[in-house]
From Swiss-Prot:
Lineage: Bacteria, Bacillati, Bacillota, Bacilli, Lactobacillales
GO MF entry, a single one: shikimate 3-dehydrogenase (NADP+) activity
PANTHER family on file: BIFUNCTIONAL 3-DEHYDROQUINATE DEHYDRATASE_SHIKIMATE DEHYDROGENASE, CHLOROPLASTIC (PTHR21089:SF1), SHIKIMATE DEHYDROGENASE (PTHR21089)
Keyword set, alphabetical order: Amino-acid biosynthesis, Aromatic amino acid biosynthesis, NADP, Oxidoreductase
EC number: 1.1.1.25
Annotated binding of shikimate, by residue: 22-24, 69, 94, 111, 238
Pathway assigned to this chain's UniProt record: Metabolic intermediate biosynthesis; chorismate biosynthesis; chorismate from D-erythrose 4-phosphate and phosphoenolpyruvate: step 4/7
Quaternary context: Homodimer.
Example of a GO biological process term: shikimate metabolic process
Gene encoding the protein: aroE
Residues the entry annotates as binding NADP(+): 135-139, 236, 260
Protein family: Belongs to the shikimate dehydrogenase family.
Enzyme class of the recorded protein, top EC level: oxidoreductase
Protein name stated in the entry: Shikimate dehydrogenase (NADP(+))
Length: 292
């Protein structure tokens, strides 16, 4: 990267903590090199206490954009000038664009687009499909919004203590009003309803942290009768590459099992385009993710 750096190099950042596990610097810097773009991508260990100063730094230094991850995806909202329609619905941001470096910051959420592009890459369409989605944190909400925007017939959301999540209930109401998709919210502790939903679904999406450390030995589905030859199972966790859920689904004959690496790639590609105006060379970047 040092050969590419110059007095004209444009900086893109990542604001999150922890950041050491992030695939983003490798992805974006390799993409800049492939396209000959005079950009550099750096990760900064920033939590909510330093976030306001960091955002002011984006404005002051003319940083062209930033990715935002935990714990800053919701905390950054009041620090921005505008939000995309999806980010406003979700109530979270993972990409900030500083157009022309002039300090007007617009927040976007690319998690949903990334998930849907990952599914499409595997030949999975969500249009007119019934989908069960577990976990309605920032990523889960973004995926739910994109599923509705892309024409899913029905989305059955499940989350622990779901009835206490007023923000999610508001999202459900808005999606039912704004789209033709039927969206419902139920408690994940209601295993009868959860199992019934999966039995009637074409696609099950796990957007919880179950399956990654320290929960790597757990799975939301443990009943083999729930796994059918026409069921697609998508776990947004990418490390480990095969979670216990995906291994269980594969062993019991699911139509297809998909991990979160594709979502990482395509949400990054969408952020890349928002900031640079260029398409990320995803075919060249995809092999890098397999090294992890």
């Amino acid at each position: 990267m040092s050969e590419r750096l110059s007095g004209h190099t444009l900086l893109v950042s990542l604001l999150a903590t922890p950041i050491r596990h992030s695939l983003s610097p490798k992805m974006h810097n390799e993409a800049y090199a492939k396209l000959g773009l005079d950009y550099a991508y750096l990760a900064f260990e920033v939590g909510t206490e330093q976030l306001a100063d960091a955002v002011q730094g984006i404005r002051a230094l003319g940083i062209r954009g930033s990715n935002v991850s935990m714990p800053n995806k919701e905390a950054i909202l009041p620090l921005l000038d505008d939000l995309s329609p999806a980010a406003e619905l979700v109530g979270a941001v993972n990409t900030v664009v500083n157009k022309d470096g002039k300090g007007h910051l617009v927040g976007h959420i690319t998690d949903g687009i990334g998930a849907l592009r990952a599914l499409a890459d595997e030949g999975v369409s969500v249009k007119n499909k019934i989908i069960t989605l577990a976990g309605v944190g920032g990523a889960g909400k973004a995926i739910a919004v994109q599923l509705a925007f892309d024409g899913a017939k029905e989305i059955r959301l499940f989350n622990r203590q779901a009835t206490r999540l007023s923000s999610v209930q508001k999202l459900v109401t808005k999606l039912n009003q704004l789209t033709r998709t039927k969206v419902t919210l139920q408690d994940l502790e209601d295993q009868t309803a959860f199992k019934e939903a999966i039995r009637e679904s074409h696609l099950f999406i796990d957007a919880t942290s179950v399956g990654m450390k320290p929960l790597e030995n757990l799975s939301l589905i443990t009943d083999p009768e729930l796994i059918r030859p026409d069921l697609v199972v998508f776990d947004i966790v990418y490390s480990p590459a095969e979670t216990k859920l995906l291994a269980f689904a594969r062993q019991h004959g699911a139509q297809k099992v998909i991990n979160g690496l594709g979502m990482v790639l395509y949400q990054g590609a969408e952020a890349f385009k928002l900031i640079t105006g260029q398409d990320m060379p995803v075919d060249a970047i995809k092999p890098l993710l397999g090294d992890e």
